[in-house]
Amino acid sequence: EQGGFYRSGKRGKLTQIEISAVVVCCHGGPGEDGSLQALFDLAGIRYTGPSQAGAAVGMDKLAFSGTMEAAGISSLPLHLITTDLELDEQGPLIVKPRFGGSSIGIEIVDDLPTAKALASSQPLLRNGAVVQRYLDDAIDLNISVRTYPEKSLSAIERPLRPEEDGIYSYADKYLTGSQGMASAPRELPAELPADIEGQLRTMASQVVDLAMVRSVARIDFLWNSAGLW
């Protein structure tokens, strides 16, 4: 049997669909967590974006954080919420779904007991929840990368979140204008000290290799007076 996709015609006759490569433009879910990539691997079809392993690491916040920490790259400590979890950090804390993105399901809480209660009751956290210290004075910084024909980095962008909102929410990203995230307010290029810009670019290049980034991707950072993560 030859791999690939087939179209079923009259009398059940199968005709192979010729596919040179698939441009993956999925946002979230099976299209971004490695499931679709695994299907293409099994079918012997080339595709854009990360491999199955790279996609899985990128969608799993706990795995990604552990990979960065093991490599010595600055990353805010992240913890899986369990009934017996204990933390030295004081609140506020930020609770996130272990899997997924776009700030969906993210909430700020005052303490660990509240985080645990939220993890056990919030439907968006049923597949796992993680918690880390919330930095109310940090700013968001993004950089895009391209790995072909060679690794290259974009200008650094600073998304501008509303002052009254504690997090850069899904609504801030996608519902602020008619063009979705393209309409979201931003500072581009971000005005940063030269040493911070250099540090961010170095870290982004390291993340590309560690997280098996392939094709085009965006890497997000937080920065305040204490450091860059």
Give the positions of each predicted feature.
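ATP-binding N-terminal substructure of ATP-dependent carboxylate-amine bond-forming enzymes
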Residues: E1-A53, V57-A63, T82-L85
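Active-site nucleotide/adenylate-binding loops and adjacent lid/helix of ATP-dependent enzymes
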Residues: G12-Q16, A55-D140, T147-E150, G198-R201
